[in-house]
Amino acid sequence: MDLWFSELHTPYVKFSIQIDKQLHSEQTEFQRIDIFESKEFGRMMVLDGYVMLTEKDEFIYHEMIVHVPMAVHPNPKRVLIIGGGDGGTARELLRYKNVESVDLVEIDERVVDISRKYLP
């Protein structure tokens, strides 16, 4: 049986990925969290029906969200991440020797728990 995940972008456009299996699904107080396994992208985290990250290309998002502001700040020492429960943004920030502390605030602790389990 073919399993597919589709993310609707507009009434005329949707992005579909063939799925090997669903590893996790739950509805939290804040959102629905799904983890899928796919041949093309590896593991995928989907929140409320939208792909948040995939193993194959998550670094692209996290590098851009971190390296651009870090390039223009003269000497960042303390950083606050709002959201980012998957940990990728924190990982990229901790590559900078001048960063002394990173605080991460995530509204949904299950995103952190599930990321630790399925997206180490």
Annotate each language-model stretch with its function:
Residues D2-W4, L53-P120:
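The AdoMet/dcAdoMet-binding core of the Class I SAM-like
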Residues M1-M44:
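N-terminal auxiliary segments of SAM/dcSAM-dependent transferases
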